[in-house]
Amino acid sequence: MAINDLQPTHEDRRVLRWGGLAGILGGVLLIVTFVIVGALVGIFAGPEAEVAAYPDVQVARTFENGLYLLALVLWAVHFIALYRALRATSPAPALYGSVLGIMSTVVLAAGALPHVVTAPISGLYHAPGATPEERATLVLAWQASQSIIDSLLIVGLVIAPIGLLLLGVAMVQTPAFGRGVGRVTIGLGAARAAAVVVLLAIPESPIAAVGIFALIAFHLVLGWRTFRLPANGLVG
């Protein structure tokens, strides 16, 4: 790598600042998403109850899904900034970790707008003249669509820990981040990997939330760290 490639430029600093802000904002938006689910949507007893109540929560669901998708887009931007910050000292783990991080967000984003499918199903369910048999079939269709969304969530959560582990290795070798931050990132990746093992064995396990909260913590902490790199003169 040429010496000039290692020198920070004004554009590099902008990449880090905006990328760091993207990571922080994405984490905040996902926290807001959970608040919306808890306060405005709630938990339903089963698929049939969820379909029946959907018109009452459709606006909240749509807003929630939009925030979730935006958070994932912002996290993808943060991964790009992390690669820029780590590539000079640890090019291989920085590249592979960032690519896998982006891949996991893409897979998660693919299932971020379930209302595109569930809203029409709900419309048919609540249509005047819908028979009990038709409604039972629509509940099954609802379950099938949710299963696809759940499978995308699980795949995204399976890929993400590998990316975190590699980025943690890169951070350990990068003075701008430090061994402490790198080891914490590796620890988060290891914890998520353990959660993934449980999730693969028991797909309906609530431990999936552990993976999501680990991602939120990662992007909040590393987002701030990335944002501060140019101000501290630690751009590599």
Task: Describe each region flagged by the PLM.
Residues 2-236:
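Hydrophobic, aromatic-enriched alpha-helical segments typical of multi-pass transmembrane helices
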